[in-house]
Amino acid sequence: MKLQINSSWQERFLADPPREKDHRPPFRRDRGRILHSAAFRCLQAKTQIHAIGENDFYRTRLTHSLEVAQIGSSIVAQMKLIDSFISLAQQLKEDRAELQKQLKLILPSNDLIESLCFAHDIGHPPFGHGGEVALNYMMRHHGGFEGNAQTFRLLTKLEPYTPNAGMNLTRRTLLGVVKYPTILDRSSPQYHQGVIVDNVDSKYVKISAWKPGKGIFRDDLKMFEWLLEPLSENDRTLFGQYKKERTRPDEVLKTRYKSLDCSIMELADDIAYAVHDLEDAIVVGVVTFQQWQSAVEKLTECRSEWIVENVQSLSQKLFSELHYERKNAIGALVNYFITHVRWKINNGFSEPLLRYNAELPDEVIEVLTIFKHFVWEYVIKHVDTQRVEYKGQRMLTEMFQIFDSDPLRLLPRNTAMRWQKATETDRKRIICDYIAGMSDAYALRVYQQL
């Protein structure tokens, strides 16, 4: 087995040679562009969990992204170790040491994985799921809205590093942030079929009725097609394959495959969400020890021996009044997930970046799912979170309508100029871009001004 990465993955949409005496490799340049972008800085004013409120301890989307980057780098280090190849070597009937020697060559550098982790949330709008639903509803006849799609759009078009190619990042970096390689309006529920009635007052949109699909905006199809040019026709077709076909008009379709780099980033994001968001909620009292017992009952029945043996002591430490004990438990959990990451093969692909992924064994996924479900049930669905998101949802829908009614008067000058030059469909997207780029606090200030 001889693996080689196509040099096309280091290409940029626009020619962009390094400046004089700039000897940084391509992915370090990408990392710098993301790190110094306005969109990245804006994450410091976007709250990770709204139920936690104003507390010096709580995480923002910026600190969350930094922690995801640290976990991502640790996963890359884990995937260099011989033990991470055991399952793959058995499956392929190949020598572990030879697999290790070859596959280490295609792992992302720390610069690359940190770039993906820094960028993974920059397209998410203010007020979390409520903001996302609000913008998806307002864009329902114009391609929809979804946070991951907006991330791709920011990186490839909106961030003003170039006139029309966003940050002009390398192909491999862009491939790594694409979690759902399809077009959004294909994967979204078929609202137009009348299953979901389109006559509700926008201020009272039901969040479950306008959940967006997962994919890339059709407006950004040109950049998406350029991104996939190095792939064979078979790989492109397989890459966009859905997990299953739609059986109900209101069903969201999700794609089956991701790139190697994206699979690492997504695992890091899931671990941070499941463990660190739980830590925040415990510290400020959003969840109680009694509520946590519902998760403990499930964890004691898991197939993971380590979890079964340690769940009681971990629980005591998580809710201990001694801060160092809680941090010890959090560190142990993060280490547990990271050290179980292993290699996975996606048969059918010829491109190494798609053929190989990172994964967790089924018994560890079971544990991670219990943690994520607990955070969802007791933190994300907490009434305080839902009220803040609902308030934000109403604010964003109303702001969209106000800007749409008199854009040249009410939009900032640069945004108004872009709106004036755009087609009717593009005009809606420009208003959406402006609102999606706001922080929670800025959106509130603008709403109060209006």
From Swiss-Prot:
GO terms for biological process: dGTP catabolic process. InterPro entries: dGTPase, dGTPase-like, dNTPase_2, HD/PDEase_dom, HD_domain, PHydrolase_assoc_dom. Keywords: Hydrolase. Coiled coil: none annotated. It comes from the Bacteria. Pfam families: HD, HD_assoc. Transmembrane segments: none annotated. SUPFAM superfamilies: HD-domain/PDEase-like. SMART domains: HDc. GO terms for molecular function: dGTPase activity. Residues 61-274 form the HD domain. Belongs to the dGTPase family. Type 2 subfamily. HAMAP family: dGTPase_type2 (MF_01212). This is Deoxyguanosinetriphosphate triphosphohydrolase-like protein. It comes from Histophilus somni (strain 2336) (Haemophilus somnus).
